[in-house]
Regions:
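Vicinal oxygen chelate
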Residues: 1-8, 30-79, 89-116, 128-130
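Conserved active-site tyrosine of GNAT-family acetyltransferases
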Residues: 19-24, 92, 120
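Short, conserved charged micro-motifs
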Residues: 18, 85-89
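Onset of an N-terminal alpha helix
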Residues: 6, 13-16
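Short glycine-/small-residue motifs
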Residues: 122-125
Length: 130
């Protein structure tokens, strides 16, 4: 099989145009490729370096408690490192995201803000503190 070359997270959005505007325009992810055909529309956005974080349910609940004050995560949540999590959260809220928690400084010295995107995806915006 060889090593994995790319992690591509596919988000199915009921309102494709709204989701594209949110991730492309508000979050600032540049479009690498897009298409429209008889099957529908799609776009690939550059989200920088990707990692896959696998958590136990108890760890997820621990993070939820810190960020939101209660368990709230589904099976997938985007955690995005940004330069300023508070400013980024405000920009995304103006684009339709709903704040679920934060800002909060975590025990691992990140400033986190939890949001829910218009398509329902949970987002943690985090800034590593010096």
């Amino acid at each position: 099989m060889g090593p994995v070359r790319e992690l591509r997270v596919a988000v199915t959005a009921e309102d494709y145009e709204e989701a594209l505007r949110f991730y492309r325009d508000a979050l600032g992810l540049p479009v690498i490729e897009s298409w429209e055909n008889e099957g529908g529309s799609g776009a690939i956005l550059d989200a920088g370096r990707a990692t896959l974080e696998v958590l136990s349910r108890s760890q997820t609940d621990f993070v939820d408690e810190i960020e939101v004050g209660r368990p709230s995560s589904g099976p997938v949540r985007f955690a995005l490192e940004v330069e300023d999590s508070v400013e980024a959260a405000e920009r995304l809220e103006a684009a339709g995201a709903e704040r679920e928690g934060g800002p909060v400084v975590t025990p691992w010295q990140h400033r986190n803000v939890r949001l829910r995107a218009p398509d329902g995806m949970q987002l943690t915006l985090f800034t590593v503190l010096d």
